[in-house]
Amino acid sequence: METKNINVCETFPDGTPIDGWFYDTNVPSLEKIGKQYVLTAYGILDDGKLHTKEIQALIDLAAKDGGGVIVVPSGTYLTGALFFKQGVHLYVAQGGMLKGSDDCSDYPICETRIEGESCLYFSALINADGLDGFVMCGPGTIDGNGMRSWKAFWLRRSWNPKCTNKDEQRPRLVYLSNCKNVLIADLNLQNSHFWTTHLYHCDHVKYLNCRIFSPASPVKAPSTDAIDIDVCSDILVKNCYLEVNDDSVVLKGGKGPWADTAPENGANERILVEDCVYGFCHGCLT
């Protein structure tokens, strides 16, 4: 655990004190997160088959039984969109990979938030709404498997240079909305179809020791922002490696001529990004 002398008065630019929450970089062990639901113990195998229904059923079972942690062991496990519930967490073990389907039809259309507006769009690979205390961690990898979408996007751009992300829709890797007290730690998050992680109306979220990556070549991964922070407060991004074919950390709050008046929009407050390393990206902070 890294600690600082919290008696030293450090403040945000507006003079607000940086409280002790920002200095606590503890990551709980797997044993402390909760009862373990290991994929292979429930017949979900590293066999190249799509296991969305089985993994979602395991999430639902854990929630029904009082919570726990879905454990992705060594191997590669293919899935579409997953929807986490209160008290259910995610741990990806060393050598483990939760790999997203490359077929966008495996990500149901839902009411969500894109480009500063509420709209219908694909769900993400990992979805959580209204959760308190959600943990995503482990030394393994969550891979969006986005190559097929990237190629489709650039093909469309070749005949319609003005096409947007709403014209050529594709899923995000992680979307958290209305959540609080979230920890995302030690993970490799890579190859998202679209934005890699997106927080909307969340507070007290920590990214610790993560590697977030999408390629700029040989096929550019379009609009794969590493961390989109959208109408959020109290966010810590610390000791992460960020290399994406767009912006690394993005502050969003609304878009368009009525952005300042729409009730779903707003400011981001108390955002701290420190001790991070940046590879190729369009901007470190935008």
Q: At which residue positions do the language-model features occur?
A:
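Carbohydrate-interacting regions of secretory-pathway proteins
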Residues: 166, 226, 275
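Extracellular "leader-to-stem" segments immediately downstream of a signal peptide or signal-anchor
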Residues: 1-178, 183, 194, 208-210, ...
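Alpha-helix capping and helix-loop boundary segments enriched in small/acidic/polar residues
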Residues: 46-49, 224, 228, 259-264
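Short, histidine-centered active-site or binding-site loop motifs used for metal coordination
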Residues: 41-44, 188, 253-255
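Short glycine/acidic-rich loop motifs that flank beta-strands on beta-rich extracellular proteins
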Residues: 67, 80-81, 101-103, 145-149, ...
